[in-house]
């Protein structure tokens, strides 16, 4: 097993996750089996209870793990399915060690950070690195580990010390350290500054780790003189200093790394069994990046949510829309609309903001209402849904978005004016959306319904069923407590709003479609978590196709085209995917 540790310096948020994912993509393109681990030094057990404004989106894995959004990058770039134990937190490590101490596993010894915490970290990494993540059930050959935060943070000291010890345990030929650092370029002088990187590497070396590769993040390509200066002061060869400057899309990052010869250096330093790295995967990646930059047609989607002030809150939603737009050769124009801005209270307090929000909504080719919690902003979402339904604007509702779509239809089309969710009004006379908990024993706790669940299609006449390739069932990831009340489903009989997907027991309503509408779909699950750059999520793809007027053409041609996995030579997906590039789209 080979281990590649990615650390960061100067500031956080400079792209360690994307760089780690890109390195994994390059190695996978060389025919190697790659897994990934993200270390978050916070004391929380997982990301499940975070405020969206604190850490952005909570990414959900197949096994129900609620993790950092960087694991979403790993899954999307590498086309793998990770587990909750691929996300290590300080809280998990301490809980693990304390539980062992309570059981008496340490035989009365004094339990300390060194060696007990550091040993637990190393043991966790070694065990999880062996777990297959690509569906082939073969052990990974390389584990890419991202250490969150920056070198010098007090929260991460135990992890740095653990890897200082681990480099000797794994042996030099199996351990590789990549340090990502910022090279700022002040606008006043325009000169690229190396001092922050020098100090960062000095701090890293002072803690016992020496970088094998320094990745410089900068706004523009770094000059050779800057590279040589970093090389001299940081005790590495010039070819061990590479630059990842700001690019038009993140799909360029693996190509930038590959162009600068990292594969050859990995091969020599780690003794990797690489014969030819010019694989079909890297060619596809380059073609996708080139196509992204050539896009001319624009599709505008309005995202109506309550966490729009921080874009990371909807990171996977944005990626899923981007994947779908790219698949049909359109550039995505995603317009974030705070749902409160659509409400009458905003009209009274700030008329300009109110009218700007409604203008965005009116200009949108499609409308998306994503998941969320709490009553704040729900009135604005209901108004956006009503606009989409009555004006025949393509609409996709995710989780809460689906629940609100059902409530809006019941109030305005079934004359059930009191229809509501018990989340917002516990004593509502018409509890259309109710708490349907699923007990989750263990650390995830609570009553959240989490992870991969099967949805069975109940009708052949479903747009979404066709988009998934006419399969009898699908498996998607969930994260919710509330669902449509199955006891009130009979109210919708012989109406346009049809429940076309249910869970395996037929008790939970998973998919709803409005038959009299070009594309009005709600799903209880979160399909964005399964979207991949070369395998877009069908519900999102349908929204983009409908918004560009190509849905019917796509559905007609799906039956004529062969199905294939658009990413690699093997796939364990529960649905096939048409070759979108062959579709005759306008």
From Swiss-Prot:
It catalyses: UTP + L-glutamine + ATP + H2O = CTP + L-glutamate + ADP + phosphate + 2 H(+). Pathway: Pyrimidine metabolism; CTP biosynthesis via de novo pathway; CTP from UDP: step 2/2. SUPFAM superfamilies: Class I glutamine amidotransferase-like, P-loop containing nucleoside triphosphate hydrolases. The modification Phosphoserine is found at residues 568, 571, 574. One of its GO terms (cellular component) is mitochondrion. Keywords: ATP-binding, Glutamine amidotransferase, Ligase, Nucleotide-binding, Phosphoprotein, Pyrimidine biosynthesis. One of its GO terms (biological process) is 'de novo' CTP biosynthetic process. InterPro entries: Class_I_gatase-like, CTP_synthase, CTP_synthase_N, GATASE, GATase1_CTP_Synthase, P-loop_NTPase. The active site is at 399 (for gatase activity), 526 (for gatase activity), 528 (for gatase activity). It is an enzyme of class 6 (ligase). Catalyzes the ATP-dependent amination of UTP to CTP with either L-glutamine or ammonia as the source of nitrogen. Constitutes the rate-limiting enzyme in the synthesis of cytosine nucleotides. This is CTP synthase 2. The lineage of its organism: Eukaryota, Metazoa, Chordata, Craniata, Vertebrata. The gene is Ctps2.
């Amino acid at each position: 097993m080979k281990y590649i540790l990615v650390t960061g310096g100067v500031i956080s948020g400079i792209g360690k996750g994307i760089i780690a994912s890109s390195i994994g993509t390059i190695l996978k393109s060389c025919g190697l089996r790659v897994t990934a681990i993200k270390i978050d030094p916070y004391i929380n057990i997982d990301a499940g209870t975070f405020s969206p404004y604190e850490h952005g989106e909570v990414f959900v894995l197949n096994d129900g793990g609620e993790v950092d959004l960087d694991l979403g990058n790993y899954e999307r770039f590498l086309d793998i399915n990770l587990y909750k134990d691929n996300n290590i937190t300080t809280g998990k490590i301490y809980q693990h060690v304390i539980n062992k101490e309570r059981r008496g596993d340490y035989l009365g010894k004094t339990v300390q950070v060194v060696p007990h915490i550091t040993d637990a970290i190393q043991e966790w990494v070694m065990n999880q690195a062996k777990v297959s993540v690509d569906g082939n059930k073969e052990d990974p050959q390389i584990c890419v580990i991202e250490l969150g935060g920056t070198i010098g943070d007090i929260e991460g000291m135990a992890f740095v010390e653990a890897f200082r010890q681990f480099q000797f345990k794994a042996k030099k030929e199996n351990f590789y350290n990549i340090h990502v650092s910022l090279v700022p370029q002040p606008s006043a002088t325009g000169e690229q500054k190396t001092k922050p990187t020098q100090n960062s590497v000095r701090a890293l070396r002072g803690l016992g780790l020496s970088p094998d590769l320094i990745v410089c993040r900068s706004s523009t390509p770094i000059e050779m003189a800057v590279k040589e200066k970093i090389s001299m002061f940081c005790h590495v060869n010039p070819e061990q200093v590479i630059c990842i400057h700001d690019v038009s899309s993140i799909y360029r990052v693996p190509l930038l790394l590959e162009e600068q010869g990292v594969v050859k250096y990995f091969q020599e330093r780690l003794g990797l069994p690489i014969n030819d790295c010019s694989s079909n995967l890297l060619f596809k990646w380059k073609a996708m990046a080139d196509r992204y930059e050539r896009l001319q047609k624009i599709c505008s989607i309005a995202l109506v949510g309550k966490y729009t002030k921080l874009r990371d809150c909807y990171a996977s939603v944005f990626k899923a829309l981007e994947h779908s737009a790219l698949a049909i050769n359109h550039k995505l124009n995603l317009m974030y609309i705070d749902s409160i801005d659509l409400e009458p209270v905003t009209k009274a307090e700030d008329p300009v903001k109110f009218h700007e929000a409604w203008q965005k909504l009116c200009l949108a080719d499609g409308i998306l209402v994503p998941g969320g919690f709490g009553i704040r902003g729900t009135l604005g979402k209901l108004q956006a849904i009503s606009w989409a339904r009555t004006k025949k604007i393509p609409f996709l509702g995710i989780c809460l978005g689906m629940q609100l779509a059902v409530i809006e239809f019941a109030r305005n089309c079934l004359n059930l004016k009191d229809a509501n969710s018990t989340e917002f009004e516990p004593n509502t006379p018409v509890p259309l959306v109710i708490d349907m908990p699923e007990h989750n024993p263990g650390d995830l706790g609570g009553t959240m319904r989490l992870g991969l669940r099967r949805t069975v299609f109940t009708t052949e006449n479903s747009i979404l069923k066709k988009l998934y390739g006419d399969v009898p069932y699908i498996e998607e990831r969930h994260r919710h407590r509330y669902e449509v009340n199955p006891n009130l489903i009979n109210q919708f009989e012989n109406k346009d709003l049809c429940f076309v997907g249910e869970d395996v027991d037929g008790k939970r309503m998973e998919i709803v479609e409005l038959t009299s509408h070009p594309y009005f779909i709600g799903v209880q699950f979160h399909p964005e978590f399964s979207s991949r750059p070369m395998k877009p999520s069908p519900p999102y793809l349908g929204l983009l196709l409908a918004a560009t007027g190509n849905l019917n053409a796509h559905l007609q041609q799906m039956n004529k085209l062969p199905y294939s996995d658009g990413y690699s030579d093997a796939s364990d997906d529960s649905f096939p995917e048409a070759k979108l590039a062959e579709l005759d789209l306008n």
